[in-house]
A protein has these predicted regions:
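N-terminal secretory signal peptides
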Residues: 1-27
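Short glycine-centered helix-capping/turn motifs at secondary-structure transition points
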Residues: 18, 78, 106, 213, ...
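Secondary-structure end/capping motifs
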Residues: 260-362
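Conserved C-terminal helix/tail region of periplasmic/extracytoplasmic solute-binding proteins
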Residues: 11, 344-408
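Surface-exposed helix-capping loop/turn segments at secondary-structure junctions
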Residues: 40-44, 185, 281-287
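N-terminal export signals
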Residues: 18, 24-46
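Pocket-lining segment of extracytoplasmic ligand-binding domains
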Residues: 115-117, 192, 205-305
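Short, glycine-/small- and polar/acidic-enriched structural segments
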Residues: 5-10, 51-201, 206-222, 226-240, ...
């Protein structure tokens, strides 16, 4: 097992010079909203964001996690250029708060965000964000200390677990699992005997915090679960894709003004991402090496960690109980760009039952059906799916609906 300092050192990488994480950013986002964060500029786009909406160059912001794989592969393989777009080198940031800030301020005009974040941005902060496609499915898990004795979610009673962001699929799925197990999630102070204390922690800090005993577990996107398993003595408790079948996690977002002003630009960007996702499905290990430290260096993580994070979903996990729904035929991470309305509706409903810091009053009375229509602009991905026959059933409208499945 690596020492906590060694785990942190994995993130000492040249790209950190572009990391604008600030400790108070998350609090500003949660308590004051985007208007407060951007200097009280009201609900209008900042000048920089307006400039981004007028910029033909694709400017990608991303967290160095496997959630960003499709965007990174589209860049690495030249799919944006082949679609007729100019693209800048993708910019990595260290935390969700930094990515939200960069997108809101106009530093990026294309990004991946955890699906609950654009819900919060659009309906709490009135920020004109639109979802263009899903970035991937599954791709997350909850890990605990290998010698913790924690065998299920009931075992998290009295424990402390880190989540990457209050408005995240991780927080939604974790709190669902805790409630189903009779454990009460709390977000302030220590956990009581029948409670699990949740705290925000940037993904790069999670494995080291677990190794140091500062937390009892964490739920996050890959490759931090794989890193925890390989370097921090962690054990996979459960994959999120084994709780919510093929759930969305990150989605591809753009500014509504960019889409309105340049619909052809949006369509070409989605074409590139759909092509990239098809490539990822067919070339999992190659893609893992490509985005790793030994490849293009999009992720400052060794190839063995990224390969495990994208391909290791086998019998050992069934034996340990991390996989309990083998019949779902899921993958550790998978790629499917269509934004099923049923999933958006369920996310909005689940957010209403999820404890977060700050004012979540905007969720009261928020109609899930309206959100599914208003937040998502699916015309581009619908056209892209039909343009690329690699996607089975893409030409059949019946394949564009599904029933959501949750089971602990």
């Amino acid at each position: 097992m690596s020492a906590p300092d060694d785990l942190s050192a994995l993130w000492t990488h040249e790209w950190t010079r572009a990391d604008w994480t600030r400790r108070n950013t998350l609090d500003a986002l949660a308590r004051g909203g985007l208007a407060a964060l951007l200097g009280g500029g009201g609900l209008a786009l900042s000048g920089r964001a307006v400039h981004a909406a007028e910029d033909d160059t694709v400017r990608i912001g991303y967290l160095p996690i496997t959630d960003a794989t499709a965007l990174l592969v589209a860049h690495a393989k030249g799919f944006f250029e082949e679609a007729g777009l100019k693209v800048a080198e993708p910019t990595p940031v260290r935390s969700w708060s930094a990515l939200v800030e960069g997108f809101a301020a106009g530093k990026f005009n294309l990004a991946h965000l955890l699906k609950p974040i654009p819900v919060w941005m659009r309906y709490n902060n009135k920020f004109p964000v639109k979802v263009l496609a899903w970035a991937h499915t599954n791709g997350s898990g909850i890990v605990v200390g290998g010698k913790s004795g924690i065998e299920d979610f009931k075992g998290l009673a009295g424990k402390r677990v880190a989540v990457p962001y209050w408005y995240s699929m991780h927080n939604v799925v974790l709190q669902y699992a805790l409630r189903e197990s009779g454990v009460v999630p709390v977000i302030r102070g220590d956990a009581g005997p029948n409670e699990c204390a949740l705290q925000i922690l940037a993904p790069p800090e999670m494995p080291a915090a677990l190794a140091a005993g500062k937390i009892d577990g964490y739920i996050v996107a890959e490759p931090f679960n794989a890193l925890g398993e390989l370097r921090a003595g962690a054990r996979m408790l459960r994959f999120t894709g084994d709780i919510w079948k093929n759930h969305p996690c990150c989605v591809v977002v753009a500014h509504e003004s960019q889409i309105a002003a340049r619909p052809e630009w949006a369509g070409k960007a989605v074409d590139a991402i759909v092509r990239a996702q098809a490539y990822c499905v067919k070339n999992r290990e190659e893609v893992a090496r490509l985005i790793s430290k030994e490849g293009r260096g999009y992720l400052p993580m060794p190839a063995d960690v990224v390969i495990k994070a994208t391909t290791d979903y086998g019998p050992a996990y069934e034996a340990s109980g991390a996989i309990r729904h083998r019949d779902w035929a899921a993958q550790r991470i998978d790629f499917q760009p269509w934004p099923y309305p049923s999933a958006t509706k369920l996310i909005v409903e689940a957010m209403g039952n999820t404890v977060v810091e700050g004012d979540a009053g905007f969720l009261k009375g928020l109609d899930p059906d309206f959100v599914a229509r208003d937040l998502v602009d699916d015309r581009f991905v619908r056209a892209s799916l039909r343009r690329y026959p690699e996607w089975p059933g893409a030409a059949d409208d019946a394949a564009l609906t599904r029933q959501e499945t949750l089971s602990l």
